[in-house]
Amino acid sequence: MKKKPFVTLEKLQEITAKYPTPFHLYDEKGIRENARALKDAFAWNKGFKEFFAVKATPNPYLIKILQEYGCGCDCSSMTELMLSKAIGCKEGDIMFSSNDTPEEEFRYADEIGGIINLDDITHIESVEKAVGGIPKTISCRYNPGGLFKISNDIMDNPGDAKYGMTTEQIFEAFRILKAKGAEEFGIHAFLASNTVTNEYYPMLAKVMFELAVKLQKETGAHIKFINLSGGIGIAYSPDQTPNDIKAIGEGVRKVYEEVLVPEGMGDVAIYTELGRFMMGPYGCLVTKAIHEKHTHKEYVGVDACAVNLMRPAMYGAYHHITVMGKEDQPCDHMYDVTGSLCENNDKFAIDRYLPKVDMGDLLVIHDTGAHGFAMGYNYNGKLKSAEILLHEDGSFEMIRRAETPKDYFATFDCFPIYERLLEDNK
């Protein structure tokens, strides 16, 4: 499948005339269409709710779009909780799934009406101490261990993951929580990441639904919801077939009716915590070719770097690249596309065949809408870029400004050197 940018060269030239590269650009039209598709795919479940994984794209202007489609927020830190509260999340709109959690974060999550999802059985005591008791509604994260397989393919290795409780622990946790006053329970699991198959969610659902039946029978706990978390991936590479969310929703429905309904559990709500699927394809990193180097290899240097998109450097992840205006030209030049960090892994592409790149060309790096800007950092003193939203009507606006040296040096503002640091930036 050929990957096409959601923005034209002409529109990009209009945007770059106002906002300098590099920047992350988001597609409002795509975000809305995808949110509607998810909602429709699970419309069969009366209590369905998506809790957007804030960690993927922590921008309030983008999350507020998702709120229009009934989405809540999946948070894992104090600042994510603060952001969610600020955009109007109410009781029941926040799922707090964290690990190694400070007590003050449990306390704040409870204060703002978040549902606490316990990562470990020892956290029961921490929550009880932090909030002065056990919340009436609470969730536990499950890790069955071993390998998670679909057919003969290993999807991931839950047994090697730091998250969640064992089977024995989650049964014990439910008994303890029920004895301490919890009235409504949820179970949660994340067993594989970025799966590009329509089978993952139905397979996970079967595991979770069967667990829910046993938990309710053996502990007497009322299971209110089952959180399938994230894991639905996106097609980063042109040779991958995107997931079909309608088929995924239908697959989960079939398992729901096979496992839960006969046990009198047809009122259990399905929750999801999708991040990558909700935003990934609807963001791109726009950068400009500013240098070329001809040594042992052919290099194209761009004005973005791993600070703007860490995934290729950190994971060796593939992100498709389009040289704007040259989409129909032959990809007959092999390049390493590099940033300016003092690290040799600061490469967006290695040995990538592209059309001939001329200096000043605009390059679109695809599928950066999740875990793109969010994973940015300041190594080498680099500053994080702006975020721009392309509206459905073709207009655009900045939804986060680029960092400045003042931002970078802000934590020195209580020291005498602060003013000297900013002498040339006033």
Where do the protein language model's features map onto the residues?
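A charged N-terminal "starter" segment
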Residues: 1-136, 171, 177-179, 183, ...
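Active-site loop/helix belt of alpha/beta enzymes
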Residues: 144-291
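Glycine-rich, aromatic-flanked loop segments that form ligand/cofactor-binding clefts
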Residues: 133-147
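Conserved, mostly hydrophobic/aromatic
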Residues: 31, 55, 77, 109, ...
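Flexible loop/turn segments at secondary-structure boundaries
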Residues: 58-61, 102, 147-148, 193-197, ...
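Structured core elements
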Residues: 72, 95, 115-117, 139-141, ...
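Charged (often Lys/Glu-rich) extended helix/loop segments that serve as interaction or gating elements
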Residues: 260, 265-426
